[in-house]
Amino acid sequence: MLEKKLSIKKTVSRFIENWVDEIADPFTSWLFQSVLHWNVIILVADGTFNEYEISFEDICLKINTRVGSRTSIQNIIKVGIAKGYFVKTASRSDNRRKVLHLSENGKKSFSEFLIRDEKTYVYE
């Protein structure tokens, strides 16, 4: 059986074709707003799907300060909560520490994004 290779040409074309849909979707429009948005959302999603706790402080430690400031990270988190994509809860190990997770809507939106993204890649 021959191994299929990624068709860069067709994949790039599909990325461009998908722009309109991504901008129309509230979640992906927010996800792609900036590199910092992408980083924060991916870190919260990783914590959610891999079942570990991640706090604002953890996120700040993982993201280079050249990508975004603590204030910008905090603002993205606040917007994520307001949009219903994130929830903030007390840590299981320390009630003073607040941790972030994707809400049910956030999990659904993120999963739908990944499924659509997977279809973008063309192998021949």
What do the PLM-derived regions correspond to, one by one?
Residues 1-14, 109:
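An acidic intrinsically disordered interaction segment
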Residues 50-63:
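Short acidic, hydrophobic short linear motifs in intrinsically disordered regions
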Residues 81-91:
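A short, conserved structural fragment
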Residues 66-82:
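Short amphipathic alpha-helical interaction segments
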Residues 91-114:
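Short, cationic-aromatic polyanion-contact patches
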Residues 111-124:
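Amphipathic alpha-helical dimerization/coiled-coil segments
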Residues 13-45:
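Short alpha-helical segments that sit at the start of domains
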Residues 59, 66-69, 91-96:
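Phosphate-/nucleic-acid-contacting segments
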